[in-house]
A protein has these predicted regions:
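Oxidoreductase and adenylate-handling cofactor-binding alpha/beta cores
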Residues: 8-20, 50-64, 159
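NAD(P)-dependent dehydrogenases' Rossmann-like dinucleotide-binding region
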Residues: 1-8
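A conserved regulatory-domain signal marking ACT and ACT-like small-molecule sensing domains
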Residues: 155, 160-195
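An anion-binding loop in the catalytic cleft
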Residues: 132-139, 157
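Substrate-binding/catalytic subdomain of NAD(P)-dependent oxidoreductase enzymes
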Residues: 25-122, 127-129
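Catalytic-loop motifs flanking and including active-site residues across diverse enzymes
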Residues: 48, 152-155
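A structural signal for short secondary-structure junctions
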Residues: 123-126, 134-136, 188-193
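Glycine-rich phosphate/pyrophosphate-binding beta-alpha loops
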Residues: 138-150
C-alpha cells in the first residue's frame, strides 16, 4: 500500500485539516506548485497508477501497463465526504495497493478509508509514503516529499546521474531478485486476488 501522489495527498490533507473545499484545496496546490495547471493526472489516479506499475515490476516482476490498473481519483470527493469519514474515525487517502497470490497480482488505486491510527493516515501534506508488510518485521513505512519543484528536480537529477554512470541498466528483472519473475503472473481485479 502507498500514497504515491503528493498532490492528491496535499489536497486531501487541506480538506481534512482546514475544512477546505476540493476546489479551494486544488487551487492552493496549484499556487504552491504542487499541482499542474491541468491537474487531471494527479487527481484522477493516473499518476499513482503509473508509479504502481513501476513498483509492481520491482516487487513482483510483472510488467503491468498503467491502463490495466483499476483506478478512481479524488476529484469526486467533497468536504462532506471528508467530514463524515473523520466523524467515524477515518481519514481518506488516495492509496495505490498491490496484492499477489501464487498466480496473479491485483493492482488498484482509489480513495480509501483508513483509521486515524493507521501509519498511512498520518502522512500529511505533499508527501508520498509506502507501507511494506513483512512476516518478521510487520509494517514498515517509508515516506518523503512527493510534490513540488525540489523533490521533482531531485528525482530527475538522480535518474540522469544513474544514466550517466551506467546504473540505469541494472534493473531488478535483469538481476532476477524475485523467484516468481516470468512465471506467468496475470493481472487480475482486486476481488479475485485479495481475500
Amino acid at each position: 500500500q502507498g500514497i504515491l501522489n503528493g498532490t492528491s495527498n496535499f489536497i486531501l490533507t487541506a480538506m481534512a485539516e482546514r475544512g477546505l473545499s476540493y476546489a479551494a484545496a486544488l487551487a492552493e496546490a496549484q499556487k504552491l506548485g504542487y499541482a499542474e495547471a491541468d491537474p487531471t493526472l494527479d487527481v484522477d489516479g493516473s499518476d499513482a497508477a503509473h508509479k504502481l506499475a513501476v513498483l509492481a515490476q520491482i516487487a513482483f516482476g510483472v510488467a503491468a501497463k498503467p491502463h490495466e490498473i483499476e483506478r478512481q481519483g479524488i476529484d469526486t470527493l467533497d468536504a462532506m465526504d471528508i467530514r463524515f469519514a473523520d466523524e467515524l474515525g477515518y481519514t481518506i487517502k488516495l492509496l495505490a495497493e498491490a496484492w499477489s497470490d501464487d498466480t496473479a497480482v491485483a493492482l488498484h488505486v482509489a480513495p480509501v478509508l483508513l483509521r486515524h491510527t493507521d501509519l498511512l493516515a498520518q502522512v500529511r501534506g505533499a508527501y508520498n509514503a509506502i507501507a511494506v508488510y513483512g512476516d518478521v518485521v510487520g509494517e514498515t513505512l517509508y515516506q518523503g516529499p512527493g510534490a513540488g519543484r525540489g523533490p521533482t528536480a531531485s528525482s530527475v537529477v538522480a535518474d540522469l546521474i544513474d544514466l550517466a554512470v551506467g546504473r540505469a541498466q541494472r534493473t531488478f528483472a535483469a538481476a532476477r531478485l524475485w523467484s516468481r519473475a516470468g512465471k506467468g503472473f496475470t493481472i487480475e481485479p482486486a476481488e479475485r486476488v485479495r481475500s
